[in-house]
C-alpha cells in the first residue's frame, strides 16, 4: 500500500513540474503564419516581422521593443490599395512607408501593439469598397490608410461615412472632387492637387516661361493638377498652352505626340510608372529641348533617374517632400527607411505620405489619451501641429475634410555625390493646399 502511494506521489510531482514548464513556455514568442493570399498573423515578443507584399490580405501584430511586448488592445491600421495593377509600384512605396513608421515605434504605441492589415483592391473603386468593408466590418480596423488612387479614395471615404465613421488618412494629394464624399473624416494631409498645380504654374511663370506643352496620362489627378497650373500660368501669368494631350494610361510609345509637339519654353508632363523612363528618352531622341516640368517628383524615383542618366539633370518638379530636405526629423526618418530598404535610395513622397499618415493618426491618439472612437480621435487629429520630415504641418477644417497648411517645394534633378536626385530649389512657405478657392 505504501509503495503504491509513493508511486502516486511521484507521478503527481512529475505532472506538476510539466505543467509549470508549459506555463513558462506560454510567455515565449509564438508565430502563426499562413501564406498570402490567406491571412497572416504574427504575434511576437521580440521578433521583427514584415508584412507580406503579395496580393491578398495580411495581418501583422508585432511588438519588437526591447522592453517587451505591449499588452493593451491592438491598434489596427488598414491599408486598402492596388498591390496588383497599374498602381502596384506606388502601392509598394506606400507599404514601405507604413512599415518604416512601425519600425520606428517598435510596432507599439502607448502600450498597445499596432496591427497592420492590408487588402489588394487592384485600383478598382468598386473592389476598394468591398475590401474596405472587409477591413472595417470583419477586421475591425481603427483607421484607413489610403487608398492612393483618387477614385478609390473617394469611394472608400463615402463608404466610411455611411458605416463606421473611422478616419481616412490619405497618402498622396487628392483632387478637389474628393471633397464631395469627405464626410468630415478625410484627412488629405498632403494637400489638394488643384493647389499643388497652381503653385507649380506660379513658379514656372515667375521663372519667365511664356509657352508650354502639356502631355498627361488621362487620370483624375492630371486634370486637377493641370487646372491649377493653368490658373497660375495662363490666367494670372499671361502664359500660353500650345498643346494639351491626355493619353491612355498604358501608353509607352509617345512618338505620335512628340512628333507633333510645337516648340515651347517648357513641357509639363504627368507621365509615371512604366511610361516615365521611355517618355523622357523618347523626348530627347526627338531633339526636343524645352525643360521637362513634372507635377509631383515621385513620378521619377532615384532608380528611374539613374536609368535616365544625365539627360534627367535639370528636370523640374513640385512636391510636398524630398529626402534631401535638411532637418533633424527628416534625417531620422531617412535613416530608418534606409535601414529597412538599403538598396532603394532615399524615400520618395509616397513613402513619406504613408509614414506621415500612420504617425498623424497615432499622434492623434496620444492627444486624446488613446481613445480610438471616431468622435474623439478625429478632432484630436484635426488639432495637431507637427514638426515632420517635410517641415511644420497644421491641419485646417475645409469643406467637410481636413487639409494641410505646410511648406510646398519646387525641386530640381541634381547630382548629389554620385546620385541623381530631387533637390529643393524654392519653397512656398506654409501655404494652404486646398482647392482653387485657397490659392492667392
Q: Whereabouts are the PLM-identified features?
A:
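Bacterial lipoprotein signal-peptidase II cleavage site
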Residues: 21-35
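Extracytoplasmic "Venus flytrap"
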Residues: 68-99, 119-126, 148-149, 215-223, ...
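Beta-alpha junction/loop-to-helix N-cap segments that form part of ligand/metal-binding clefts
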Residues: 89-96, 103-178, 246-255, 277
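Extracytoplasmic ligand/sensor domains, especially the bilobed periplasmic-binding protein
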Residues: 126, 141-245, 291-316
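Extracellular/periplasmic periplasmic-binding protein-like sensory domains
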Residues: 280-355, 366-368, 422-439
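Segments of small-molecule ligand-sensing domains
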Residues: 339-351, 362-422, 439
